Protein backbone atom coordinates (compact mmCIF):
# COMPACT_ATOMS: atom_id res chain seq x y z
CA UNK A 1 0.00 0.00 0.00
CA UNK A 2 1.09 3.57 -0.71
CA UNK A 3 1.23 5.89 2.28
CA UNK A 4 -0.04 9.44 2.02
CA UNK A 5 -1.79 9.06 -1.35
CA UNK A 6 -5.48 8.30 -1.84
CA UNK A 7 -7.15 7.12 -5.04
CA UNK A 8 -10.09 9.11 -6.40
CA UNK A 9 -12.21 7.71 -9.23
CA UNK A 10 -14.52 10.05 -11.11
CA UNK A 11 -17.68 8.22 -12.16
CA UNK A 12 -19.63 11.21 -13.36
CA UNK A 13 -22.77 9.59 -14.72
CA UNK A 14 -24.46 9.46 -18.10
CA UNK A 15 -22.29 10.20 -21.14
CA UNK A 16 -23.88 12.14 -23.99
CA UNK A 17 -21.99 10.18 -26.65
CA UNK A 18 -22.47 6.77 -25.03
CA UNK A 19 -26.02 7.40 -23.83
CA UNK A 20 -25.29 5.68 -20.52
CA UNK A 21 -22.99 5.78 -17.51
CA UNK A 22 -19.61 4.73 -18.91
CA UNK A 23 -18.41 3.38 -15.57
CA UNK A 24 -21.24 0.81 -15.70
CA UNK A 25 -20.34 -0.54 -19.15
CA UNK A 26 -19.01 -4.09 -19.14
CA UNK A 27 -15.77 -5.62 -20.35
CA UNK A 28 -15.10 -9.32 -19.80
CA UNK A 29 -18.23 -9.51 -17.66
CA UNK A 30 -17.11 -6.78 -15.28
CA UNK A 31 -18.29 -3.21 -14.95
CA UNK A 32 -15.71 -0.65 -16.03
CA UNK A 33 -15.59 0.83 -12.54
CA UNK A 34 -14.86 -2.63 -11.11
CA UNK A 35 -11.95 -3.06 -13.50
CA UNK A 36 -10.50 0.29 -12.43
CA UNK A 37 -10.92 -0.56 -8.73
CA UNK A 38 -9.24 -3.95 -9.16
CA UNK A 39 -6.34 -2.34 -11.04
CA UNK A 40 -5.51 0.06 -8.22
CA UNK A 41 -6.83 -1.47 -4.99
CA UNK A 42 -3.49 -3.03 -4.01
CA UNK A 43 -1.71 0.31 -4.32
CA UNK A 44 -3.85 2.66 -2.22
CA UNK A 45 -5.10 2.45 1.35
CA UNK A 46 -7.99 4.83 0.66
CA UNK A 47 -10.32 4.87 -2.33
CA UNK A 48 -12.98 7.51 -2.95
CA UNK A 49 -15.51 7.37 -5.79
CA UNK A 50 -17.14 10.64 -6.87
CA UNK A 51 -20.48 10.13 -8.58
CA UNK A 52 -23.68 11.95 -9.49
CA UNK A 53 -25.49 8.69 -8.72
CA UNK A 54 -23.88 7.29 -5.55
CA UNK A 55 -26.70 4.79 -5.09
CA UNK A 56 -25.24 2.76 -7.98
CA UNK A 57 -22.26 1.92 -5.80
CA UNK A 58 -24.12 0.62 -2.77
CA UNK A 59 -22.10 -2.58 -2.64
CA UNK A 60 -21.96 -4.59 0.56
CA UNK A 61 -18.63 -5.02 2.34
CA UNK A 62 -16.93 -2.53 0.04
CA UNK A 63 -13.56 -1.01 0.82
CA UNK A 64 -14.25 2.38 -0.68
CA UNK A 65 -16.18 5.54 0.06
CA UNK A 66 -18.72 6.93 -2.39
CA UNK A 67 -19.48 10.66 -2.35
CA UNK A 68 -21.73 12.95 -4.37
CA UNK A 69 -20.43 15.84 -6.42
CA UNK A 70 -20.23 19.14 -4.55
CA UNK A 71 -21.09 22.58 -5.94
CA UNK A 72 -23.89 20.97 -7.92
CA UNK A 73 -25.39 24.36 -8.77
CA UNK A 74 -22.45 24.77 -11.13
CA UNK A 75 -21.92 23.14 -14.52
CA UNK A 76 -20.91 19.49 -14.32
CA UNK A 77 -17.22 19.17 -15.12
CA UNK A 78 -14.15 17.07 -14.45
CA UNK A 79 -12.72 19.97 -12.44
CA UNK A 80 -15.73 19.84 -10.13
CA UNK A 81 -15.19 16.11 -9.69
CA UNK A 82 -11.50 16.57 -8.90
CA UNK A 83 -12.36 19.33 -6.42
CA UNK A 84 -14.92 17.10 -4.70
CA UNK A 85 -12.52 14.17 -4.47
CA UNK A 86 -9.70 16.24 -2.99
CA UNK A 87 -12.01 17.59 -0.28
CA UNK A 88 -12.92 14.04 0.74
CA UNK A 89 -9.53 12.33 1.01
CA UNK A 90 -7.72 11.95 4.32
CA UNK A 91 -4.23 11.69 2.79
CA UNK A 92 -2.01 14.54 1.61
CA UNK A 93 -2.29 13.61 -2.08
CA UNK A 94 -4.98 12.27 -4.36
CA UNK A 95 -4.34 10.25 -7.51
CA UNK A 96 -7.24 11.04 -9.83
CA UNK A 97 -8.61 8.43 -12.26
CA UNK A 98 -11.49 8.42 -14.72
CA UNK A 99 -14.01 5.64 -14.22
CA UNK A 100 -13.71 4.47 -17.83
CA UNK A 101 -10.00 3.65 -18.10
CA UNK A 102 -9.79 -0.16 -18.36
CA UNK A 103 -6.05 -0.56 -19.02
CA UNK A 104 -4.40 1.23 -16.11
CA UNK A 105 -0.74 0.41 -15.50
CA UNK A 106 0.12 -0.06 -11.80
CA UNK A 107 3.79 0.41 -12.70
CA UNK A 108 3.13 3.88 -14.10
CA UNK A 109 1.09 4.80 -11.04
CA UNK A 110 3.93 3.79 -8.74
CA UNK A 111 6.48 5.68 -10.84
CA UNK A 112 4.40 8.86 -10.66
CA UNK A 113 4.04 8.54 -6.91
CA UNK A 114 7.80 8.08 -6.67
CA UNK A 115 8.29 11.35 -8.57
CA UNK A 116 5.95 13.07 -6.13
CA UNK A 117 8.15 12.02 -3.23
CA UNK A 118 11.25 13.60 -4.80
CA UNK A 119 9.98 17.17 -4.49
CA UNK A 120 7.04 19.15 -3.16
CA UNK A 121 4.96 19.17 -6.33
CA UNK A 122 1.37 20.34 -6.26
CA UNK A 123 0.45 18.34 -9.36
CA UNK A 124 2.13 15.60 -11.38
CA UNK A 125 0.48 15.18 -14.76
CA UNK A 126 1.34 13.26 -17.94
CA UNK A 127 1.38 15.16 -21.24
CA UNK A 128 0.77 12.63 -24.01
CA UNK A 129 1.18 13.72 -27.63
CA UNK A 130 0.97 17.30 -26.44
CA UNK A 131 -2.26 16.78 -24.47
CA UNK A 132 -2.60 16.99 -20.70
CA UNK A 133 -4.06 13.94 -18.95
CA UNK A 134 -5.72 15.46 -15.85
CA UNK A 135 -7.71 12.30 -15.12
CA UNK A 136 -4.57 10.24 -14.60
CA UNK A 137 -2.65 12.62 -12.38
CA UNK A 138 -1.54 13.29 -8.80
CA UNK A 139 -2.81 16.36 -6.93
CA UNK A 140 -1.98 17.79 -3.53
CA UNK A 141 -5.09 17.87 -1.39
CA UNK A 142 -4.78 21.62 -0.84
CA UNK A 143 -5.28 22.27 -4.56
CA UNK A 144 -8.99 22.17 -3.84
CA UNK A 145 -8.95 25.67 -2.33
CA UNK A 146 -7.80 27.28 -5.57
CA UNK A 147 -9.99 24.99 -7.65
CA UNK A 148 -13.06 26.06 -5.70
CA UNK A 149 -12.42 29.72 -6.45
CA UNK A 150 -11.95 28.90 -10.12
CA UNK A 151 -15.23 26.96 -10.17
CA UNK A 152 -17.09 29.78 -8.43
CA UNK A 153 -15.89 32.06 -11.21
CA UNK A 154 -17.40 29.52 -13.64
CA UNK A 155 -14.09 28.63 -15.20
CA UNK A 156 -14.16 24.87 -15.69
CA UNK A 157 -10.91 24.38 -17.62
CA UNK A 158 -8.55 22.08 -15.75
CA UNK A 159 -5.58 23.40 -17.73
CA UNK A 160 -6.24 26.88 -16.32
CA UNK A 161 -5.82 25.40 -12.84
CA UNK A 162 -2.32 24.24 -13.69
CA UNK A 163 -1.12 27.83 -13.97
CA UNK A 164 -1.66 28.30 -10.23
CA UNK A 165 0.44 25.37 -9.03
CA UNK A 166 3.90 23.85 -9.04
CA UNK A 167 3.47 21.24 -11.75
CA UNK A 168 5.66 18.37 -12.96
CA UNK A 169 4.80 17.38 -16.53
CA UNK A 170 5.67 13.83 -17.55
CA UNK A 171 6.34 13.27 -21.24
CA UNK A 172 5.46 10.36 -23.51
CA UNK A 173 9.07 9.18 -23.27
CA UNK A 174 8.81 9.00 -19.50
CA UNK A 175 5.48 7.19 -19.46
CA UNK A 176 6.38 4.51 -22.03
CA UNK A 177 9.06 3.24 -19.66
CA UNK A 178 6.25 1.96 -17.44
CA UNK A 179 3.37 1.57 -19.91
CA UNK A 180 4.77 0.52 -23.29
CA UNK A 181 1.64 1.24 -25.32
CA UNK A 182 0.39 4.13 -23.15
CA UNK A 183 -2.79 2.10 -22.67
CA UNK A 184 -3.43 3.76 -19.31
CA UNK A 185 -4.68 6.80 -21.21
CA UNK A 186 -7.25 4.92 -23.28
CA UNK A 187 -10.77 5.71 -22.18
CA UNK A 188 -14.23 4.87 -23.45
CA UNK A 189 -15.91 7.85 -25.10
CA UNK A 190 -17.83 6.21 -27.94
CA UNK A 191 -19.33 2.81 -28.84
CA UNK A 192 -16.37 2.41 -31.20
CA UNK A 193 -13.97 2.84 -28.26
CA UNK A 194 -15.84 0.13 -26.37
CA UNK A 195 -15.60 -2.24 -29.31
CA UNK A 196 -11.89 -1.48 -29.67
CA UNK A 197 -11.35 -2.27 -25.99
CA UNK A 198 -13.18 -5.57 -26.33
CA UNK A 199 -11.06 -6.52 -29.33
CA UNK A 200 -7.94 -5.56 -27.40
CA UNK A 201 -8.96 -7.95 -24.66
CA UNK A 202 -9.66 -10.65 -27.22
CA UNK A 203 -13.20 -11.27 -26.03
CA UNK A 204 -16.58 -9.71 -26.73
CA UNK A 205 -19.50 -9.77 -24.35
UniProtKB/Swiss-Prot annotation:
It is found in: Cytoplasm. It comes from the Bacteria. Gene3D superfamilies: Spore Coat Polysaccharide Biosynthesis Protein SpsA, Chain A. This is Probable molybdenum cofactor guanylyltransferase. The gene is mobA. Its cofactor is Mg(2+). Transmembrane segments: none annotated. Mg(2+) binds at residue 100. Its main location: cytoplasm. InterPro entries: MobA-like_NTP_Trfase, Molybde_CF_guanTrfase, Nucleotide-diphossugar_trans. One of its GO terms (molecular function) is metal ion binding. It catalyses: Mo-molybdopterin + GTP + H(+) = Mo-molybdopterin guanine dinucleotide + diphosphate. Its EC number is 2.7.7.77. GTP binds at residues 10-12, 22, 69, 100. PANTHER family: MOLYBDENUM COFACTOR GUANYLYLTRANSFERASE. It is an enzyme of class 2 (transferase). The N-terminal domain determines nucleotide recognition and specific binding, while the C-terminal domain determines the specific binding to the target protein. HAMAP family: MobA. Keywords: Cytoplasm, GTP-binding, Magnesium, Metal-binding, Molybdenum cofactor biosynthesis, Nucleotide-binding, Transferase. GO terms for cellular component: cytoplasm. Belongs to the MobA family. Signal peptide: none annotated.
